[in-house]
Amino acid sequence: YEISACLVGSEMCIRDRSRGLPRTYGHKKGAETVRIVVESAIELDVEYLTLFGFSSENWNRPKDEVIDLMSLLRGYLVKEVEALDKKGIKFRVVGDRQRLDCDIVEMITSAEKLTADNAELTLTLALSYGGRRAISDAAKKLAMQVYKRQLNPNEICEEMFNQALETKMFPDPDLVIRTSGEKRISNFMLWECAYSEFVFIDTLWPDFCHKDLSAAINEYSGRNRRFGSSI
């Protein structure tokens, strides 16, 4: 399976349980959930797992919240990458790295190099990611090739566009899981999710666990994927 999950509900976790806790409490709980979901994905024979951790729109949140989220990301990279490597997990990041701090980019690059040859599971974090930006960036790449006379515009096809995307290294998602009861795509992998199956669950991301992932996969397995055909 190729599974993508939108990590929604960290802030709702705080609103629902205690108004006295800091906003970042839910994000910390959500970060802990990543470890649980990664382990569950391996147990359930998932080959590719993409987690939508920080969108391009999230930069518009309060500055102190963004700083705390970046601190959590640093902590995750420091604490978890070695463990991911030992478990045979390949680590990838997609998104606009130019907006990330230099030390974070260096840690990401180091983690990707360390785990490059692993094959147990490919874990991708979408950070500073936006589906529209990803599509426009791919279009710019192809447009530049046309401008340099390296490409005939009449030769451009879907597969060529796929190869221009930064997600070209893994297949389109079979299943997209949206937590917290939200029923929208939130600018996530707009091109790649054309024929994905969606499962919407009420569970908040910090509470997401093995049984939730298993239930979503079971629901997906019972569906008839037609990819636009009538059969």
Regions found by a protein language model. Give the residues of each.
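Flexible, compositionally biased loop and terminal segments
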Residues: 5-11, 15-231
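Short, exposed "boundary/linker" segments that immediately precede the start
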Residues: 1-3
